[in-house]
Amino acid sequence: TMPLFDNENRILQIETEKEKIFKLMENPLISQPFTEDFAKRFSWSTNAIEGNTLSLEETIAVLDYDEVRSNHTYSEYADAKNAYYAIQKMLLPFAKAIIDEEWIKKANGYIRHMQGEYRDTTVYVGNLSEAVYYPPEPQDVPELMRNWIRGADIEAVTVQEIFEKIAANHVRFERIHPFSDGNGRTGRMIINQQLIN
């Protein structure tokens, strides 16, 4: 069977073209529309993964014109706006940043439009009748996160090595599940900051 993605060729393409891309991004006529497009698409996709039913077009309409349509909940529109705001505050302009406890809590706070604090309750992944994973107890989260943060600064030589280390780091973050909500969206913000770094 054919793989869904031809990762080897895509990684090779990124490896060979990254310097050219970095050079092009120095031109504001290229970087500004790219950055805006990234922010909107990431806002849409990070929420779609969580089950938000807004289309990309509907997400852009609410972000650009505050336009809402029927068949969607208020929270779906709020999630789109919150994610976009988080991206604007935390990831743009694309610049290196230290991913520490403050950064992570701030990102989660923007995503949820509230104070980003580690959870103080037991949570589960899945639904009430079929939990697929029980994250660590809340009292263990601060220490687990301190340990996780020590490995958040990804050092690698090749693009493939960067991707592999970030993916493994992301799995560890999601297994800790440090927040009562927004862990997936926060984790994807971290992935993007790690790629920027």
PLM features: residue spans?
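FIC/Doc superfamily catalytic core
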Residues: 1-197
